[in-house]
């Protein structure tokens, strides 16, 4: 199995690059975000490789990092997600943003991927929620709060305060982070109005 290729960029196709490794041209399929980050023809490049072997073909998928390749593998553990959809997701969201979106249960961010509808986005967020925190950059408390809201187990004042901030135009991750900070400073007895006020202060920092 091929795990990594280092060579010169020969040419580009719509969704692949030809990498010349000591005179042998390897066709490597990549996410559009990865292709855009690669150098021009004639320059050196290194790609982490995932090798797919089928009865009728061998296909190579390339990634800028081992982490991106790991997400490619994780995504395909989700029902309804194959290699094409996984690459599409990674074209829309870099690994760090994907991890944060899953940790925050942000289905809308995942659903922005072409070819990924609400149901598939929900499956990605739900089935990978236990694997994302290790990769995510978000505060674990914020991720926990977002999960509680998704599961309808968050305290009512907290859920209402986040909903109010979202209605004011803030994104779900922003609102959850602000209210999580507000709840920490205000304590368990804080009511919705107080949380909204403190949350807005957090957002204005």
UniProtKB/Swiss-Prot annotation:
Region (Flexible linker): 144-153
Main subcellular location: cytoplasm
Keyword DNA damage listed: yes
Localization (cell): Cytoplasm
Region (Domain II): 65-143
InterPro entries noted in UniProt: DNA_helicase_Holl-junc_RuvA_I (IPR013849), Hlx-hairpin-Hlx_DNA-bd_motif (IPR003583), NA-bd_OB-fold (IPR012340), RuvA (IPR000085), RuvA_2-like (IPR010994), RuvA_C (IPR011114), RuvA_C_sf (IPR036267)
Subunit structure comment from the entry: Homotetramer. Forms an RuvA(8)-RuvB(12)-Holliday junction (HJ) complex. HJ DNA is sandwiched between 2 RuvA tetramers; dsDNA enters through RuvA and exits via RuvB. An RuvB hexamer assembles on each DNA strand where it exits the tetramer. Each RuvB hexamer is contacted by two RuvA subunits (via domain III) on 2 adjacent RuvB subunits; this complex drives branch migration. In the full resolvosome a probable DNA-RuvA(4)-RuvB(12)-RuvC(2) complex forms which resolves the HJ.
Family to which this protein belongs: Belongs to the RuvA family.
Protein name: Holliday junction branch migration complex subunit RuvA
Source species of the chain: Rhodopseudomonas palustris (strain BisA53)
């Amino acid at each position: 199995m091929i795990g990594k290729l280092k060579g010169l960029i020969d040419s580009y196709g719509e969704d692949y690059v030809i990498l010349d490794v000591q005179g042998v041209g390897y066709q490597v399929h990549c996410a559009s975000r990865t292709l855009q980050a690669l150098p021009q023809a004639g320059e050196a490049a290194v790609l982490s490789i995932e090798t797919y072997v089928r009865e009728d073909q061998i296909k190579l998928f390339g990634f800028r990092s081992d982490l991106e390749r790991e997400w490619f593998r994780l995504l395909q553990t989700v029902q309804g997600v194959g290699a094409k959809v996984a690459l599409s997701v990674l074209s829309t969201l870099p690994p760090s943003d994907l991890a944060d979106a899953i940790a925050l249960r942000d289905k809308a961010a995942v659903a922005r991927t072409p070819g990924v509808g609400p149901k598939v986005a929900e499956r990605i967020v739900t089935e990978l929620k236990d694997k994302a925190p290790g990769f995510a950059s978000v505060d674990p408390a914020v991720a926990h709060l977002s999960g509680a809201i998704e599961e309808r187990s968050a305290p009512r004042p907290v859920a209402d305060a986040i909903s109010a901030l979202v209605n004011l135009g803030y994104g779900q991750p922003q609102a959850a982070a602000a209210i999580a900070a507000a709840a920490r400073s205000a304590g368990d007895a804080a009511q919705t109005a107080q949380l909204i006020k403190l949350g807005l202060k957090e957002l204005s920092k």
